[in-house]
A protein has these predicted regions:
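A short glycine/serine-rich beta->alpha loop
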Residues: 67-72, 116, 310-313
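Polybasic low-complexity intrinsically disordered regions
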Residues: 13, 29, 87, 96, ...
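Secondary-structure capping and boundary motifs in well-ordered enzyme cores
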Residues: 51-54, 73-80, 118-122, 284, ...
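Alpha-helical support elements that line or immediately flank enzyme active sites
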Residues: 80-92
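A short, flexible helix-boundary coil/loop motif
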Residues: 302, 336-338
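Charged, often Cys/His-bearing segments associated with DNA-binding zinc-finger transcription factors
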Residues: 1-56, 63-64, 338
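An N-terminal domain-cap segment
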Residues: 59-79
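Helix-centered, glycine/charged polyanion-binding patches within enzymatic domains
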Residues: 27-29, 237-238, 243-314, 318
Length: 338
């Protein structure tokens, strides 16, 4: 060995994992168990949602706009197509990925009541055309209204107070696409020390139940405060929001009204920091305001809707109506199933 050279000890393992059948069998059993548990959770979720979604009311609203089969091939069953659309929302699937998933996932076939041996699976073009039909007639807004009417009837939408909030939804910032440019309706905004490009989803949430009653979509550079009145239903006795909604004019208007309590967190200003009393009030208000995070958690963390799927604010806002309609049902599923 020459001076300065390193020595490396090589340890050889003459046996592979295959020589340890107990180990491999245990590992396989673990993987199978995890896969089985995941399948059971998916099937349970789909079964519960199938039972609580007001299918008949939704189909009645859609029927006047659906294909009448006067010419061309017979249209696919309306309920089947609506179920496929909902599967896309729950799993963040594109139209081609949705078609493929129907073939691959038994839980989807069971939910859709499709037999691959005898039934024809809708292709990606059929799935796309159905979504365009929903968008053309803004049916997602009507589906949202149907869900909230059901929840109000059951006593889960009190309308005594509203919590307002917004979330950023990212859009592709690259220009490497067919048009060679970014979506002109999307814009950038700064949050903390980081810049984001995309849109905002704004919601008004029932302060008692946490149910979303108002939805709006804007470019990311629109200030939260601008959307406040759009998110109110008009019968509130209290308004909750973070510092982004702080506005002396609105606060004074509530005081003059005398019937609406303003619980929006106070904002500190340059040379005018918050007092200890204001900080204490803000902490107390944030405990109520946390309910607005639940629907965002459902659509962004559970259903992975963190990026826009379409170009333009309008189409993505309509998708938000569908997502929050389903999120409302999901959050109240135990009560609805009881």
């Amino acid at each position: 060995m020459h001076k300065g050279e390193m020595t490396v000890d090589v340890v050889c393992f003459p046996h592979t994992l295959a020589t340890f059948p107990m180990f491999t069998m245990a590992a396989q059993a673990t993987f199978l168990s995890i896969a089985h548990q995941k399948k059971l959770r998916c099937e349970r979720f789909l079964n519960e949602m199938d039972r609580i979604i007001p299918w008949q009311q939704m189909l009645d609203v859609m029927r006047p706009h659906y294909y009448d089969n006067a010419v061309g091939r017979p249209a696919k069953d309306m309920k089947l197509m609506l179920k496929i659309y909902f599967l896309q929302q729950w799993n963040d699937l594109s139209d081609p990925a949705m078609e493929e998933a129907i073939y691959d996932r038994c839980s989807f076939q069971k939910f859709l009541q499709i037999d691959l041996l005898s039934d024809t699976v809708p292709d990606e073009t059929t799935i796309l055309n159905f979504r365009h039909l929903l968008e053309e007639h803004r049916l997602q807004e009507q589906l949202f209204a149907i869900v909230n009417a059901l929840l109000a009837q059951k006593g889960y939408l009190m309308k005594k107070g509203t919590i307002v909030d917004a979330t950023l939804i990212a859009a592709p910032s690259s220009t490497k696409n067919r048009e060679g440019k970014r979506d002109p309706e999307m814009h950038q905004t700064k949050k903390g020390n980081q810049w984001y490009f995309g849109m905002k989803g704004h919601i008004g949430v029932d302060a008692d139940s946490g149910v979303v009653h108002s939805v709006a979509g804007t470019a990311a550079n629109i200030h939260d405060r601008v959307m406040l009145h759009t998110l109110l239903h008009g019968s509130e006795k209290a308004i909750f929001g973070d510092q982004g909604y702080a506005c002396d004019g609105d606060k004074d208007a509530c005081r003059r009204n005398g019937e609406i309590h303003w619980f929006v967190s106070d904002r500190g200003r340059r040379n005018h920091p918050l007092s200890n009393g204001q900080r204490k009030k803000n902490r107390k208000r944030s405990s109520v305001r946390s309910k607005v995070e639940h629907p965002f958690h459902v659509i962004k963390n559970l259903w992975k809707h963190t990026k826009v799927r379409y170009r333009g604010i309008a189409k993505n806002t309509l998708q938000l109506y569908a997502l929050f309609a389903l999120a409302n049902l999901y959050m109240k599923r135990r009560q609805l199933l009881a």
